[in-house]
């Protein structure tokens, strides 16, 4: 295959089959690939991920995808870890004994793709169980086109222990002990902390909105939170 309209980036760190099924269920064709040329030529790019930022960035670099992803100009949608990898960096907690000095209690900062100027940090759950796993509501929703037909109070499915704080790039928020960014965006890059592919009809609406998105909509003035 030399081209595809819609692609899912294969970083080796995601349940790609469930994302592919969620897209195809809506009647869209989609290709899973780590081919740089196919990704660059696609009209829409979906960037899912699960697990640790360190492992995912290692895979991205091993596949020579870092510069290609940073250079994309078409709409890109990240899910969960995919959203977190769009930020400047992720703080993944204490270094393990296999990473050097056992007495080093400093946090491990993982440089990410630096597509959206915010950072990911441990979720301030204020005593709530981590990971934050299950259905939760969006507490605020901007007018970003990815949220067409989505309202404050709508439920989405989350699984995460890290989150991006509220910033000028927040386009939706959620609360779990503290308020965090449920979605962020800058230019052509959009990230959702929740899993659209696991969020029933409303999650399907997010995916459909993205795949039907006219890139000119991203250039319109948005009212962020």
Curated annotation (Swiss-Prot):
E.C. number: 4.3.2.10, 3.5.1.2
Cited InterPro entries: Class_I_gatase-like, GATASE, Imidazole-glycPsynth_HisH
Localisation per UniProt entry: Cytoplasm
UniProt key word Hydrolase: yes
One Pfam family cited in the UniProt record for this chain: GATase
Any single GO CC term annotated in Swiss-Prot or TrEMBL for this entry: cytoplasm
Predominant cellular place of this UniProt entry's protein: cytoplasm
GO biological process, one term: L-histidine biosynthetic process
Highest taxon above the source species: Bacteria
CDD domains, A to Z: GATase1_IGP_Synthase (cd01748)
MF terms in GO: glutaminase activity; imidazoleglycerol-phosphate synthase activity; lyase activity
Domain Glutamine amidotransferase type-1: 5-220
Active site: 80 (nucleophile), 195, 197
Catalyzed reactions: 5-[(5-phospho-1-deoxy-D-ribulos-1-ylimino)methylamino]-1-(5-phospho-beta-D-ribosyl)imidazole-4-carboxamide + L-glutamine = D-erythro-1-(imidazol-4-yl)glycerol 3-phosphate + 5-amino-1-(5-phospho-beta-D-ribosyl)imidazole-4-carboxamide + L-glutamate + H(+); L-glutamine + H2O = L-glutamate + NH4(+)
Keyword terms, alphabetized: Amino-acid biosynthesis, Cytoplasm, Glutamine amidotransferase, Histidine biosynthesis, Hydrolase, Lyase
Pathway: Amino-acid biosynthesis; L-histidine biosynthesis; L-histidine from 5-phospho-alpha-D-ribose 1-diphosphate: step 5/9
Binding partners and assembly: Heterodimer of HisH and HisF.
Annotated NCBIfam families: IMP_synth_hisH
Function: IGPS catalyzes the conversion of PRFAR and glutamine to IGP, AICAR and glutamate. The HisH subunit catalyzes the hydrolysis of glutamine to glutamate and ammonia as part of the synthesis of IGP and AICAR. The resulting ammonia molecule is channeled to the active site of HisF.
The protein, known as: Imidazole glycerol phosphate synthase subunit HisH
Species annotation: Colwellia psychrerythraea (strain 34H / ATCC BAA-681)
Taxonomic placement: Bacteria, Pseudomonadati, Pseudomonadota, Gammaproteobacteria, Alteromonadales
